[in-house]
Amino acid sequence: CINANAHALARYAALCQENEIVPIVEPEVLMDGAHTIDRCYEVTKRTLEVVFSELVAHGVNLKGICLKPNMVIDGTLVTDKSSPKTIAEKTISCFKEVVPEDVPGIVFLSGGQSEIEATENLDQMNKIGNLPWNLSFSYGRALQASALQAWSGKVENEETASMAFNHRAEMNSLATLGKWDAGLEK
C-alpha cells in the first residue's frame, strides 16, 4: 500500500511539474488508533523514505515541491499523550533522517488534532530552530473549527466567525515563527 501510494504521489508530482505547477506531496500517516509516538515515528519514516525514493525515480525536482505530512504523534486512543516538546523533537528527528534539505517547505496537516494542539506542536517545532526547511501549516479543521462553530450557519454570526478565524490564523502565523504562547489564546 505504501509503495503504490508513493508511486502515485510521485507520478502526480512529476505531472504537476511538467505543467509548471508546484505539487503538494501529501503522504499522511493517520493518527487513528492506539499506536505510540514511537510507532508513528517508524511508520512516518518508512513512508517518507519510500515517497522520496519514488520522487527521485520519477525525476521530480525536490526544490519545487511542497511537502504536506503528518506530525509524529500518538494515536487518538492513547490516553497518556506525548508533550508538544516531545512531538516536536520526534517529528524533527524523523524528518532530518529522511527529508532532503532540497525540500524548501513543509506544511503540516493537523490530522485531527485540536486547534490548540496543532498550533502548539508547530510552535514547538519552530522553536527548535536552525532547520533546513520552512515549517508552516495547511490545517483544515484546526484552522476553521472555532469559526464554523461561531458562525453556525447564521448571517448574524458572520462577524464573530470572521474574528474567530482571524484569531486562529494569527496564532498559527505566530507558531510558524516560534513566537506563539498559550497566553495569547482567548
Give residue spans per PLM region:
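Helix-rich catalytic cores of soluble enzyme domains
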Residues: C1-S53
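Active-site capping/gating regions of soluble enzymes
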Residues: H35-K186
